[in-house]
Amino acid sequence: MKMFTVISYDIVDDQRRTSVMKVLKGYGVRVQYSVFEAILDAREFHDLSNQLRKIIDPGQDSIRCYRLDQVAAQRTVIYGIGLTTTDPTHYMV
């Protein structure tokens, strides 16, 4: 089952931060400077997690992933500009 996933990151090193951003762009939509939204099934989330863990320095960097079911995702509130990600915009082949 696909789940609405919010991924935020705080990466110290510019090169690692750029690498993380490029990986995330392949899975979802950037909604803020260090925040992405994606709709991922368990396999996609597992693959994404593995890629991100290979990039970061766990002693310096932080990535947080919030997996929301459909009910929780529908309670998302946005103030200001922007839309909630509702459909997958990237497909893995």
Swiss-Prot record:
Gene3D superfamilies: 3.30.70.240. Mg(2+) binds at D10. The keyword Acyltransferase does not apply. It holds the Pfam family CRISPR_Cas2. The keyword Nuclease applies. Keywords: Antiviral defense, Endonuclease, Hydrolase, Magnesium, Metal-binding, Nuclease. GO terms for biological process: defense response to virus; maintenance of CRISPR repeat elements. Its cofactor is Mg(2+). GO terms for molecular function: metal ion binding; RNA endonuclease activity. This is CRISPR-associated endoribonuclease Cas2 3. InterPro entries: CRISPR_associated_Cas2 (IPR021127), Virulence_VapD/CRISPR_Cas2 (IPR019199). Its EC number is 3.1.-.-. The gene is cas2-3. Belongs to the CRISPR-associated endoribonuclease Cas2 protein family. Homodimer, forms a heterotetramer with a Cas1 homodimer. CRISPR (clustered regularly interspaced short palindromic repeat), is an adaptive immune system that provides protection against mobile genetic elements (viruses, transposable elements and conjugative plasmids). CRISPR clusters contain sequences complementary to antecedent mobile elements and target invading nucleic acids. CRISPR clusters are transcribed and processed into CRISPR RNA (crRNA). Functions as a ssRNA-specific endoribonuclease. Involved in the integration of spacer DNA into the CRISPR cassette. It comes from the Bacteria.
